[in-house]
């Protein structure tokens, strides 16, 4: 399943990279100021560019870390030692595969996602339940989220490992979310995809000994642009007025690992701190300055 994301460049990646290569030779530094799902940044790394990836959203930050900052397969040394006392660690599997297997078997719980985003829930700020996930998948999300948060708090995960697991969780949730395309609202009935079981999968990591060449930043493009030195800057601003912070609020909550107030029928998190002027007709010109 592909990443359901507005403005994804998967289908035009060769055109974009082709134009970049005309303007900047391989091994040059390219800034991807609004990196989104990281498709362009990843392809640039494959072609031996030095990449600076920036985006406002936390989920994008984790995607870029995973795409740009792995030189070898993760060994999850502390986590494997921790879970070996109560979970079967299979010698025929890699440490990463064992960790994903462990997370897929975490005990579900009725927590924040089940209460706020499933049809069995009783949301605090809505008269009716929201239908973003099946009750079973929402409980799985709650169980896995709690485990990842606890492992992070106990320093059992490195920052790199945490980003990888959050990336995997976001990708798995996006596959089975009961949405038409964005998280601005849910579909009234659970469709076939939403009825399938949440299942984390190992990411096919791009492993290269070039991680020192790449920089990952999070913040407003207008503010971070002046901090970046590069040979070419690739800017892919939003094409419409819909704010990414609102339309992908659930992915942002998964990335942050928090439990924000879910507001209104759609259960939006407070997102004004990630409001983009590039989505506003009256402000976009000043943002480019």
Regions picked out by a protein language model, each given a short descriptive name:
Residues 1-34, 39-47, 60-63, 69-70, ...:
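S-adenosyl-L-methionine
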Residues 16, 30-44, 53-58, 226-247:
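Conserved proline-anchored active-site loop of SAM-dependent methyltransferases
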Residues 26, 212, 228-229:
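Residue-level preference for short coil/turn positions at secondary-structure junctions
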Residues 50, 57, 61-205, 241, ...:
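Class I S-adenosyl-L-methionine-dependent methyltransferase module
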Residues 207-215:
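A short helix-to-beta-strand connector/capping loop
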Residues 218-223:
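Conserved SAM/SAH-binding loop
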């Amino acid at each position: 399943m592909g990443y359901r994301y507005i403005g994804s460049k998967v289908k035009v990646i060769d055109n974009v990279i082709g134009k970049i290569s005309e303007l900047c030779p391989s091994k040059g530094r390219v800034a991807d100021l609004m990196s989104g799902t990281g498709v362009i940044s990843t392809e640039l790394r494959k072609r031996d560019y030095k990449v600076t990836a920036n985006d406002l959203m936390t989920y994008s930050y984790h995607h870029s870390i995973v795409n740009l900052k792995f030189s070898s397969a993760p060994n999850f040394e502390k986590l494997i030692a921790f879970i070996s006392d109560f979970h079967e660690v299979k010698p025929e599997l890699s440490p990463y595969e064992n960790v994903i297997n462990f997370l897929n078997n975490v005990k579900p719980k009725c927590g924040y996602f089940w209460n706020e985003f499933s049809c069995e829930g009783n949301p605090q700020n809505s008269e009716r339940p929201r239908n973003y996930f099946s009750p079973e998948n929402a409980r799985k999300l709650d169980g896995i989220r709690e485990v990842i948060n606890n492992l992070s708090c106990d320093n059992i995960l490195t920052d790199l490992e945490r980003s990888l697991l959050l990336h995997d969780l976001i990708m798995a949730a996006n596959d089975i979310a009961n949405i038409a395309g964005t998280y601005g609202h849910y579909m009234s009935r659970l469709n076939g995809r939403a009825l399938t079981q949440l299942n984390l999968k190992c990411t096919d990591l791009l492993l290269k000994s070039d991680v020192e060449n790449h920089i990952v930043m999070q913040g407003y493009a207008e503010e971070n642009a002046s901090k970046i030195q590069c040979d070419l800057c690739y800017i892919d601003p939003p094409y419409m007025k819909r704010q990414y912070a609102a339309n992908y609020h659930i992915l942002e909550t998964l990335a942050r690992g928090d439990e924000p107030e879910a507001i209104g029928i759609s259960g939006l998190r407070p997102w004004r701190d990630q409001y983009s002027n590039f989505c506003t007709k009256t402000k976009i010109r000043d943002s480019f300055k």
